[in-house]
Swiss-Prot record:
Cross-referenced NCBIfam families: gatE_arch, PRK04028.1
Cited HAMAP family: GatE
Annotated organism of origin: Thermococcus sibiricus (strain DSM 12597 / MM 739)
Reaction catalyzed: L-glutamyl-tRNA(Gln) + L-glutamine + ATP + H2O = L-glutaminyl-tRNA(Gln) + L-glutamate + ADP + phosphate + H(+)
Taxonomy, superkingdom: Archaea
Family (UniProt): Belongs to the GatB/GatE family. GatE subfamily.
GO molecular function terms listed in the Swiss-Prot or TrEMBL record: aminoacyl-tRNA ligase activity; ATP binding; glutaminyl-tRNA synthase (glutamine-hydrolyzing) activity
Protein name per UniProt: Glutamyl-tRNA(Gln) amidotransferase subunit E
UniProt GO BP: glutaminyl-tRNAGln biosynthesis via transamidation; translation
Complexes and interactors: Heterodimer of GatD and GatE.
Gene name of this polypeptide: gatE
A matching Pfam family: GatB_Yqey
Keywords, comma-separated and alphabetical: ATP-binding, Ligase, Nucleotide-binding, Protein biosynthesis
Region annotation Disordered: where it falls in the sequence: 405-426
């Protein structure tokens, strides 16, 4: 059952960060910005954190460094050069990417900067060969108006995208260099969003502005939406990787639910008098208790020479199993923290289970000398690994006493979230010394401002008013980026309603039968040209497009001729209709014009795609009158 929250009284604050790839060359070299699967070379690196310009080290970077992983990079000579293996300084930023960033700045009601200064953002998870990402502010102080009020856009940044992850491992990660350096626009809002639906409206507005440029990439992985969510008494949580617009409200609702439940746990721990110093780093070796266990997981660990270690969590019983999101508990949060070392954990609130018996549970309780409200957590692994995992669990338990820890979390498909790493600090940036400041001239700003593309929603409204087409058709044309083609067809003399119907309804319907991706804009324009020249009927379009999807090497005219879809002359059509009327003369004489429907059905069965429906109607009517007068 969906829980309704009073977001105003909860003090909900949400900010968005939207990242979208630009469809230009790479940001700091002229190689193509395309993904590929061909690997020509590989190399290995290890990365270390450095101090920011303030002399501080970012905690998220430090935590990644402690994992001690090596990074293997796969490259292709066509899509990677020396810049992106960090063996050559960056070239000057791509001019087209800068112009698109400036367009987006104006579309979001923001003010462009006078000079673009690139900075280095420390990233040592392996996704950047150099250990940093280059980023620059191009616009500031934009805004989005919503029914709940205005939401600010303090910064619009142009940056380089990271490598593509191929394989993650405990000791090694493999990345592909093809995505590294693809220009990325990053748009951040102020935390002035106070309702989940408001967040969706803001995200759509920004997405529409990006699409209006016609210079953003489409498809899986080209857009990444991050949320920053907090409530009164809770903490700021960064949620990464929200893919679908419709999931934004769901994820926010679930995060509010999670924080409220964590605050309930905090309150209960305070009632029980738990203090951080009560949670001691004392590991208990309980391996002997499980020597004859029925748990397959534990038995496998013991067979490999591993151990079963336990820690005591005073007064946590009943709270580790407390549900904080649908299907997720405080114990799940603890397990997420331990996952960098072990696959899973066992805790008292879920036992007996997983082959662990009540007798084994009782023995652990006795060994740890647990009281009525005390809990334990078990880990099965090599001794040192088990200790590392239990330290993570102990840290998460200490954080539970304070309520909601600040974290970066991963969005899950069901709307829940999962721990990724500590929230990055501000100690991540330092100046980029290889790229001089870029002056944004008044002439360039004026040129961009005077040639801004039409905003998508304004275009939808114009289509409805000017071309008298249904709003849902107009919206789909714009959302699917078929609007330019639509306007070209109208310029050819095609009726707007027909053009919209074919582009939206017919072609989408064909997707169920054939791969419409094979149908090019040239195919579509050529087919409509045949229609405009009265060489085919509009009824023939669907069959022509279906055949072109199967055989894209053919032309629309070839298909029309091969399939016998070219229009018959009026005389040929009249002759066929007269034959149909003669075959049904008794019905015609009996019903007169009442036979119109039946005759039209039979005529169209023979003439569909070979004659215009309007002409067929006129000639059927004419023949009925001739034979009944």
């Amino acid at each position: 059952m969906k829980v309704e929250f009073d977001y105003k009284s909860l003090g909900l604050k949400v900010g968005l960060e939207i990242h979208r790839q630009l469809d230009t060359k790479k940001l700091f070299s002229a190689v193509p910005s395309q993904l590929h699967d061909n690997v020509d070379f590989t190399f290995e690196r290890r990365l270390r954190p450095t101090m920011s310009e303030l002399g501080e080290i970012d905690q998220a970077a430090l935590e990644e460094f402690k994992r001690g992983r090596a990074f293997v990079y796969e490259g292709n000579y066509k899509y990677t050069d020396l810049v992106y293996v960090d063996e050559e300084p960056p070239h000057m930023p791509d001019e087209e990417a800068l112009k698109v960033a400036l367009q987006i700045t104006y579309l979001l009601n923001a003010i462009p900067v006078d000079e673009v200064h690139f900075m280095r953002k420390i990233v040592i998870d392996g996704s950047n060969v150099s250990g940093f990402q280059r980023t620059a502010i191009v616009g500031m102080n934009g805004k989005v108006d919503t029914p709940w009020g205005s939401v600010g856009i303090p910064t619009i940044c142009l940056e380089e995208d990271a490598c593509r992850i191929i394989e993650q491992g405990e000791r090694k990660a493999i990345y592909r260099l093809d995505r590294l350096g693809i220009p990325l626009i990053e748009i951040a809002t102020t935390p002035d969003i106070h309702h989940p639906e408001q967040a969706k409206i803001v995200a759509k507005f920004i997405g529409d502005a990006l699409r209006a440029t016609r210079k953003v990439k489409r498809g899986l992985g080209t857009i990444r939406q991050d949320l920053n969510v907090s409530i009164k008494g809770g903490a700021r949580i960064e949620i990464k990787g929200v893919q679908e617009l419709d999931m934004i409200p769901v994820i926010i609702e679930r995060e509010v639910q999670r924080q409220l439940n964590l605050l309930k746990i905090k309150e209960e721990l305070q009632k029980r008098g738990v203090k951080e110093e009560d949670l001691k780093e004392e590991f208990y070796d309980v391996t002997d208790i499980f020597s004859g266990t029925g748990s397959k997981i534990i038995a496998r660990t013991l067979k490999k020479g591993g151990k079963i270690l336990a820690i005591k969590l005073p007064k946590f019983r009943g709270l580790i199993g407390f549900e904080i999101q649908p299907g997720r508990r405080l114990g799940t949060e603890m397990a997420d923290r331990a996952k960098k070392y072990v696959k899973g954990i066992f805790h008292i609130d879920e036992l007996p289970n997983y082959g662990i018996s009540q007798e084994e549970v009782d023995k652990v309780v006795e060994r740890l000398n647990l009281g009525e409200f005390d809990a334990f957590v078990l880990v099965a692994a090599e001794e040192e690994i088990a200790k590392k995992a239990l330290r993570e669990i102990l840290q998460r338990a200490r954080e539970a006493i304070s309520g909601v820890p600040e974290e970066t979390r991963r969005a899950l498909p069901d709307g829940n979230t999962q721990y990724m790493r500590p929230l990055p600090g501000k100690a991540r940036m330092y100046p980029e010394t290889d790229i001089p400041p870029i002056f944004m001239s008044e002439e360039l700003k004026k040129e961009i401002l005077e040639n801004l593309p039409e905003y998508p929603q304004a275009k939808v409204n114009r289509y409805v008013k000017e071309y008298k087409i249904d709003k849902s058709l107009a919206q789909t044309l714009v959302d699917d980026e078929r609007d330019e083609l639509f306007e070209e067809l109208i310029a050819m003399g095609i009726k707007p309603s027909l053009a919209a119907s074919i582009l939206v309804v017919v072609l989408k319907g064909l997707k169920k039968e054939v791969s419409t991706d094979n149908i090019t804009e040239t195919h579509i324009k050529d087919a409509f040209k045949l229609l405009h020249e009265n060489k085919i009927a509009k009824e023939a379009l669907e069959e022509i497009f279906k055949e072109l999807a199967l055989h894209p090497e053919k032309t629309a005219l070839q298909v029309a001729e091969e399939k016998g879809l070219t229009l018959l002359s009026e005389g040929e059509v009249e002759k066929i209709i007269e034959e149909i009327v003669r075959e049904n003369i008794d019905v015609v004489k009996e019903k007169g014009m009442g036979a119109m429907g039946m005759l039209m059905g039979r005529a169209m069965a023979k003439l569909r795609g070979k004659a215009d429906g309007k002409l067929v109607n006129q000639l059927v009517r004419k023949k009925i009158q001739e034979f009944t007068s």
